[in-house]
């Protein structure tokens, strides 16, 4: 019994020593951790002071780690579809934009030229009215179309001659009427043995027409 008690006492003492030793190790580890944290705090304070001095008294944030740069992408919308290209330098993207702008400008210029070429000629209102009112011009145009159909050489209409013909139309009509009345009067005179009232009236009307023609 004495031996067992001695062994137990010895084991108990060893256990107590082991516990005490582990407690001391833990204390030492805690002291080391505290010292490290204190050193880190001091280092951070020094860095903040240096940052303030460099920024002119303003606080400056130092990033711990910079994120990786995103690769440059080019997105193109064309024909209702979306195309995305990776790793496109800015110079190449600018060149593509210049080429697209030049192509768009050329397409718009082509459309405008085509619209101008297709536009029908507009006839002025004054010329249209003159063509509708003047029968002489209509007759000359019909003569020109007939000459084209038959293969004859065309003769250009002179505006001064057209105006002269328009002015001479009433005089020509009066002269033809005068000649007709004179012939009719001569026929009646030759047939009748003596002058009648109707012939006298016709002579008077013929004299009036002659007087009007001379006055003009």
Curated annotation (Swiss-Prot):
Subcellular location: Nucleus
One Pfam family in the UniProt entry: Jas_motif
UniProt motif Nuclear localization signal: location: 172-179
Keyword Transferase assigned: no
Post-translational modification: Ubiquitinated. Increase in jasmonoyl isoleucine (JA-Ile) levels mediates its degradation via COI1B-mediated proteasome pathway.
Induction details: By abscisic acid (ABA), wounding, and drought and salt stresses. Induced by jasmonate (JA). Negatively regulated by the SCF(COI1) E3 ubiquitin ligase-proteasome pathway during JA signaling.
Short motif Jas, span: 170-194
Location of the region described as Disordered in the Swiss-Prot/TrEMBL record: 1-47, 184-216
Alphabetically ordered keywords of this record: Jasmonic acid signaling pathway, Nucleus, Transcription, Transcription regulation, Ubl conjugation
Example of a GO biological process term: floral meristem determinacy
Tissue: Expressed in roots, stems, leaves, spikelets and seeds.
Keyword Glycosyltransferase: no
Membrane spanning residue stretches: none
InterPro entries (alphabetical): CCT_CS (IPR018467), TIFY/JAZ (IPR040390), Tify_dom (IPR010399)
GO CC, alphabetical: nucleus
PROSITE patterns given in the database record: TIFY
Primary location: nucleus
Biased composition (Basic and acidic residues): 1-38
Domain Tify: 67-102
Subunit-structure text: Interacts with COI1B in a coronatine-dependent manner. Coronatine is an analog of jasmonoyl isoleucine (JA-Ile). Interacts with MYC2.
Protein family according to the UniProt entry: Belongs to the TIFY/JAZ family.
Function: Repressor of jasmonate responses negatively regulated by the proteasome in an SCF(COI1) E3 ubiquitin-protein ligase complex-dependent manner. Involved in jasmonate (JA) signaling pathway during spikelet development. Targets directly the transcription activator MYC2 and suppresses the activity of MYC2 in triggering the transcription of MADS1.
Domain-related comment: The jas domain (170-194) is required for interaction with COI1.
Protein name: Protein TIFY 3
Organism for this UniProt entry: Oryza sativa subsp. japonica
Gene that specifies this protein: TIFY3
């Amino acid at each position: 019994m004495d031996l067992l008690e001695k062994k137990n006492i010895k084991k108990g003492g060893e256990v107590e020593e082991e516990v005490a030793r582990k407690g001391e190790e833990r204390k030492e580890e805690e002291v080391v951790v505290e010292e490290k944290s204190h050193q880190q705090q001091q280092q951070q304070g020094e860095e903040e002071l240096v940052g303030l001095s460099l920024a002119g008294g303003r606080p400056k944030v130092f990033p711990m780690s910079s994120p990786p740069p995103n690769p440059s992408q080019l997105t193109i919308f064309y024909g209702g579809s979306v195309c995305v290209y990776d790793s496109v330098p800015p110079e190449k993207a600018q060149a593509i934009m210049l080429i697209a702008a030049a192509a768009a400008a050329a397409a718009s210029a082509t459309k405008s030229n085509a619209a101008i070429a297709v536009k029908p000629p507009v006839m002025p209102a004054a010329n249209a009215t003159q063509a509708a009112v003047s029968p002489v011009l209509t007759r000359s145009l019909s003569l020109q179309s007939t000459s084209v159909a038959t293969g004859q050489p065309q003769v250009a209409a002179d505006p001064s001659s057209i105006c002269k013909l328009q002015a001479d139309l009433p005089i020509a009509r009066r002269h033809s009427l005068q000649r007709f009345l004179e012939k009719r009067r001569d026929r009646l005179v030759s047939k009748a043995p003596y002058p009648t009232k109707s012939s006298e009236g016709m002579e008077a009307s013929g004299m009036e027409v002659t007087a009007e023609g001379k006055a003009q």
